[in-house]
Amino acid sequence: MHAHCLPFLLHAWWALLQAGAATVATALLRTRGQPSSPSPLAYMLSLYRDPLPRADIIRSLQAEDVAVDGQNWTFAFDFSFLSQQEDLAWAELRLQLSSPVDLPTEGSLAIEIFHQPKPDTEQASDSCLERFQMDLFTVTLSQVTFSLGSMVLEVTRPLSKWLKHPGALEKQMSRVAGECWPRPPTPPATNVLLMLYSNLSQEQRQLGGSTLLWEAESSWRAQEGQLSWEWGKRHRRHHLPDRSQLCRKVKFQVDFNLIGWGSWIIYPKQYNAYRCEGECPNPVGEEFHPTNHAYIQSLLKRYQPHRVPSTCCAPVKTKPLSMLYVDNGRVLLDHHKDMIVEECGCL
């Protein structure tokens, strides 16, 4: 994880958003006489300003390559961002083609989608581009719509399995040889977007933690052509303190007699509540279950150590304690929540 570069990345992206909001112009493109369409940045800005979020995560992938041959349409995208399990709610192709496309009056379109990792800049310019087929399916003309000047094709079903099982693409790449495509002298300019609207899986919701950290990891892996989540975890553990001094759960024995509660608590008289102690690294990793706020704070702490306080080692998961005690002459059995620390993290 190149966490030391993230603040500069965030700053550059924010500057781009500000500049794009002020100067972005509609592309002079037309599709079957439709009006010109807003640029990808302008479209994402319109979603950003939408007061009603459509999904937890909305991604726009610009096509690496596009081929339209009659009723056979081929699209290549870089899916290297795949890392965490997500539930795909909706996926659509938004086409802003540079020349008019005459759709057939009947029949269907054959759509083929490939994963094409961004080429290694160190490879020879005459080397081929490797592609891996993700799906081949048909789209009926009734599924083709127009929105904001773009031709829109709904492609949720073919792509949902890849987001549901992100490791499947990596396994396929290791098992099946990809197709070799000649590398163009200059990157092709395409105006085809794949819009992915996805929600965090139930497992991710239960785990909690920093969604921003996951996205930062995903962004860096995509830039470096890495698909493995483990890759990011291994490379993030540099410049850490001694692991024995990091935030962790330690024993913490509670004796109710010492605090004067032993007269009315029947059982237990003592129990191990555990507590949290230790340092929080900067930046903090997902193993410490940071919130988004804590993750940003830990990044700033690394660059401004004298101005920003460290995140605190504190309980992030607790469990109840069953207690038998006397209350107004009655013996009660009650389960009191948040009495025992199960996991510690940096908040």
Swiss-Prot record:
Molecular function terms from GO: cytokine activity; growth factor activity; morphogen activity; type I activin receptor binding
UniProt signal peptide: 1-26
Entry-listed glycosylation sites: 72, 199
SUPFAM superfamilies on file: Cystine-knot cytokines
Keywords per UniProt: Cleavage on pair of basic residues, Cytokine, Developmental protein, Disease variant, Disulfide bond, Glycoprotein, Growth factor, Heterotaxy, Secreted, Signal
Cysteine pairs bridged by disulfides in the record: 247-313, 276-344, 280-346
Keyword Cell membrane tagged: no
One BP annotation, GO: liver development
Localization annotation: Secreted
Pfam families documented for this protein: TGF_beta (PF00019)
Keyword Secreted found: yes
Result after altering residue 203 to K: In HTX5; likely benign; decrease in signal transduction
Removed propeptide positions: 27-237
Impact upon substituting residue 275 to C: In HTX5; decrease in signal transduction
Gene Ontology cellular component annotations, sorted alphabetically: extracellular space
Origin superkingdom: Eukaryota
Subunit structure: Homodimer; disulfide-linked.
UniProt disease link: Heterotaxy, visceral, 5, autosomal: An autosomal dominant form of visceral heterotaxy, a complex disorder due to disruption of the normal left-right asymmetry of the thoracoabdominal organs. Visceral heterotaxy or situs ambiguus results in randomization of the placement of visceral organs, including the heart, lungs, liver, spleen, and stomach. The organs are oriented randomly with respect to the left-right axis and with respect to one another. It can be associated with a variety of congenital defects including cardiac malformations.
Family: Belongs to the TGF-beta family.
Role noted for this protein: Essential for mesoderm formation and axial patterning during embryonic development.
Protein's name according to its UniProt entry: Nodal homolog
Organism lineage: Eukaryota, Metazoa, Chordata, Craniata, Vertebrata
